[in-house]
A protein has these predicted regions:
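His-Asp phosphorelay/catalytic-motif detector in bacterial-type signaling
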Residues: 13, 57-59, 84-89
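Receiver (REC) domain active-site loop signature in two-component systems and cognate sites
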Residues: 67
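Active-site residues of response regulator receiver
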Residues: 20, 64
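Conserved small/polar residues in nucleotide/adenosyl-binding loops
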Residues: 95-100
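Acidic catalytic/metal-coordinating carboxylates
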Residues: 24, 44-48, 71-77
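Two-component/phosphorelay signaling modules centered on CheY-like receiver
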Residues: 23-41, 47, 55
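Short amphipathic alpha-helix used as the core "switch/output" element in two-component signaling
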Residues: 51, 73-86
Length: 100
């Protein structure tokens, strides 16, 4: 029998770093996450992502794979090699929003 445990987690305690070079993707994710009461930081490239990961210490990084200059795999590799950021979970994404 499972004990009855009521655990309430406030999403506002968690910060998500959204990294994507496509503005519509960033806006969609920001709206979805803020509606769920997460704190959201957005950046548009890998260099900014590396800087914000160190400075803001997000709880999660949503990272686009297909970005110019430094792709998501390169960013993830650098984050995992850095002792200051290696603990942060990363979700790599291939989001393409079609607007008609």
């Amino acid at each position: 029998m499972t004990p009855d445990v009521n655990v309430v987690i406030s999403h506002s305690e968690y910060t998500v770093l959204v990294v994507d070079d496509v503005v519509s993707n960033v806006l969609l994710l920001k709206v979805l996450l803020t509606n769920e009461k997460f704190k959201v930081i957005t950046v548009g490239n890998g260099k900014e992502a590396l800087s914000q990961a160190v400075n803001a210490r997000p709880d999660l990084i949503l990272l686009d794979v297909m970005m110019p200059e430094m792709n998501g795999f390169e960013v993830a590799e650098r984050l995992k090699a850095d002792p200051e950021t290696q603990h942060i979970p990363i979700i790599l994404s291939l989001i393409h929003i079609l607007l008609f």
